[in-house]
């Protein structure tokens, strides 16, 4: 928030400026670096994290990474849309000059760079903010969030999730009961107390209470209503810091998408290589890079997918 303030990107109501699209974000990042001397934006490029978050940018440019037809999967990202998306990332380095000098940035490093004042903006989520404070002693008041910017073909946000393990010793009746329980919109008093206890631990560690977390439950469900009421009663930061992000969770113009349906981690690794090439070489050919990447993904991974 401090670097945005220095560059004039805090609005009169205290909210951080919302970039309408990825190109405005690049312009903001460029100005922030010019004013503060610090990189305006950092994005991961390694350990599959770069490819993972690049899909979110690319969807906004109209990219479809794979298609299934007649039971076979085909790689489909050697397109003009993906060339444009990769060119955008290339321009962050060579046109806008707003990235850190180190271009090999993994999933841990980009959060550390941001949280320790090495860059003004990065990707984030409501559930990912506590580690910024816990791991790197970031001032919780210096952390703000806005909605995902739009691409030429729309606004897309990558959904997260969690793993729930069910014992292989359970029978079918037990499994049905478990899935029914997972979908209950009610919340018991025991669950409420457990939630309050766990969240109080965060508060005691100085974690901010402010950003909402995207939920599979509707706002009107008893469970979500409890979560929202608790958050509102325990907010410990300037709510303007997170207002635009919180509002965006109910914004119908943002399309939520799950990760790619086949060989996602392998795709991310290949896309990491694409990002690194365009950030290392000012003369890199985005189309040639994507043609090779598309071919490799098809031959090395999708050809083995039977359904």
Question: For each of these PLM feature ranges, what is it?
Answer:
Residues 24-31, 71-103, 148:
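Glycine-centered hinge/linker elements that transmit conformational signals in sensory
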């Amino acid at each position: 928030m401090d670097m945005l303030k220095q560059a004039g990107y805090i609005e009169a109501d205290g909210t951080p400026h919302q970039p309408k699209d990825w190109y405005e974000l690049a312009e903001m990042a460029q100005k922030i670096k010019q004013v503060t001397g610090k990189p305006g934006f950092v994005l991961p490029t390694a350990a599959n994290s770069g490819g993972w978050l690049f899909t979110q940018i690319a969807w906004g440019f109209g990219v479809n990474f794979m298609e299934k037809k007649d039971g076979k999967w085909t790689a489909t990202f050697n397109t003009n849309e993906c060339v444009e998306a990769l060119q955008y990332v290339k321009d962050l380095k060579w046109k806008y000059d707003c990235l850190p000098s180190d271009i090999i940035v993994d999933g841990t490093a980009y959060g550390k760079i941001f949280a320790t004042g090495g860059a003004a903006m990065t990707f984030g989520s409501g559930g990912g903010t506590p580690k910024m404070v816990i791991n790197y002693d970031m001032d919780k008041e210096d952390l703000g969030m806005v909605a995902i910017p739009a691409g030429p073909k729309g606004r897309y946000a990558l959904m997260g999730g969690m793993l729930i393990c069910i014992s292989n010793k359970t029978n079918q009746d037990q499994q049905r009961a478990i899935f029914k329980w997972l979908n209950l919109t009610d919340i018991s008093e025991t669950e409420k107390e457990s939630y309050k206890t766990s969240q109080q631990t965060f508060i005691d560690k100085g974690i901010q209470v402010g950003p909402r977390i995207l939920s599979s439950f509707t706002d009107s469900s008893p469970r979500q209503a409890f979560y929202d009421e608790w958050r509102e009663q325990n907010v410990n930061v300037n709510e303007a810091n997170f207002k635009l992000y919180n509002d965006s969770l109910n914004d119908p113009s943002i399309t939520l998408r799950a990760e790619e349906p086949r060989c996602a981690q392998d795709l991310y690794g290949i896309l990491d290589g694409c990002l690194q090439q365009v950030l290392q070489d000012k003369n890199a050919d985005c189309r040639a890079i994507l043609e090779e990447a598309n071919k490799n993904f098809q031959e090395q991974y999708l050809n083995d997918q039977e359904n």
